[in-house]
């Protein structure tokens, strides 16, 4: 099950430098040129989770396999992208394919690196990108109205429901608000998702600051954080330049380097976790002497569907799930101890998997 987070931003905000650091590769050409990222670069990153290391230690697992999140570095957006300016058409097509958006905002001053708008104004940069995405959504929805109206007049129930959703979204977008803020009922979620709106995707703001501000941020990142709070979104402050340096170091060297900067952990770890939370994902584990492995599912997933992430046969033939809470697995020294303490539960088809569950599935072939 793949989950994709698209990295977006105006040209020269540090987007590709960040992507390179994320994937520990120089796949993206992080040059001081507006359209250096023409084809989207895709990279998978491990989601840091100390629980997995602890489980592997207890079970003496031979291998540790973390869950992964995919980041897509998308070509820099410019004003007018909704009308195909710059690399707008490619940008818009690619962003439709991701599940969430990490919006990199330039929060540093550097006379050697040009800003496409000529000044450092992170909130204005955010508005530029949001506006282009909203204009693209408006165009997309307006093209559907006539066809849906005709179908609705012919008593097409689905068309009536979709037309109502489209009209409500149009009102919101014309007010200058992204589609993700549209109030909707649970039963409307599927139809809403099918609209494929760019501004419906959850957003994480990444404040790219200068090295000296990596620990505490600066006035620019504070403004973005306040904007995120008002939106009910999340903002992460990092220095892409520092992260690209950290990416080349060994684990021991990273710890020493972070300490000298006054940082407890790499900014990328915070970013990856924030992306994971943004997508409302949780982790369950399978643990044994061969391997300890983390698996990604959406919050609210029931046991059979969770089993299906490992293999479709597990879901089709699901019987039950032997389940131990992470805290119990650790407290009682593993599966045998948890079983003896009565902490191993047999869960059926309606069980909603909890974050951190250690699971073993029983199924019919």
Where are the model-predicted features located?
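Short capping/connector residues at structural and topological boundaries
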Residues: 6, 35, 40-43, 50-52, ...
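Phosphate-binding glycine-rich loops and adjacent basic patches that engage nucleotide phosphates
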Residues: 14-20, 48-60, 88-112, 125-135, ...
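Short, glycine/charged-enriched secondary-structure capping and boundary segments
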Residues: 22, 84-87, 116-119, 218-222, ...
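Conserved Switch II/interswitch segment of TRAFAC-class P-loop GTPases
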Residues: 43-48, 75-85, 96-158, 172-185, ...
């Amino acid at each position: 099950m793949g989950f994709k987070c698209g990295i977006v931003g105006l040209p020269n905000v540090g987007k590709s430098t960040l992507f390179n650091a994320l994937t520990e590769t120089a796949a993206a050409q992080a040059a001081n040129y507006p359209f250096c990222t023409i084809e989207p670069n895709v990279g998978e990153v491990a989601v840091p989770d100390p629980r997995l290391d602890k489980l592997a230690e207890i079970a003496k697992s031979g291998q540790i396999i973390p869950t992964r999140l995919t980041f897509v570095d998308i070509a820099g957006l410019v004003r007018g992208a909704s009308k195909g300016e710059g690399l707008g058409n490619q940008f818009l097509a690619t962003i439709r394919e991701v599940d969430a958006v990490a919006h990199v905002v330039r929060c540093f001053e550097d006379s050697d690196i040009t800003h496409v708008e000529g000044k450092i104004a992170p909130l204005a940069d955010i508005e530029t990108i949001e506006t282009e995405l909203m204009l693209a959504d408006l165009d997309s929805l307006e093209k559907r109205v006539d066809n849906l109206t005709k179908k609705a007049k012919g008593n097409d129930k689905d068309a009536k429901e979709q037309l109502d959703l489209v009209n409500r979204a149009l009102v919101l977008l014309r007010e200058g608000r992204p589609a993700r803020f549209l109030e909707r009922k649970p039963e409307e979620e599927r139809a809403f998702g099918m609209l494929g709106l760019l501004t419906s995707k959850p957003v994480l703001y990444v404040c790219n600051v200068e090295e000296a501000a990596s620990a505490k941020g600066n006035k620019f990142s504070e403004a973005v954080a306040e904007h995120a709070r008002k939106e009910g979104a999340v903002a992460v402050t990092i220095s892409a330049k520092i992260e690209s340096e950290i990416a080349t170091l060994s684990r021991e060297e990273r710890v020493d380097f972070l300490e000298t900067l006054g940082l407890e952990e790499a900014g990328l770890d915070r970013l990856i976790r924030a992306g994971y939370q943004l997508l409302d994902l949780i982790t369950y584990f399978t643990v044994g002497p061969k391997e300890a492995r983390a698996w990604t599912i959406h919050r609210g997933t029931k046991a059979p569907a969770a089993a299906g992430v490992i293999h479709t046969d597990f879901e089709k033939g699901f019987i039950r799930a032997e389940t131990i809470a992470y805290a119990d697995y650790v407290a009682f020294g593993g599966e045998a101890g948890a079983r003896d303490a009565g902490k191993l539960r047999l869960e059926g088809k309606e069980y909603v998997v909890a974050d951190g569950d250690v699971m073993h599935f029983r199924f019919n072939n």
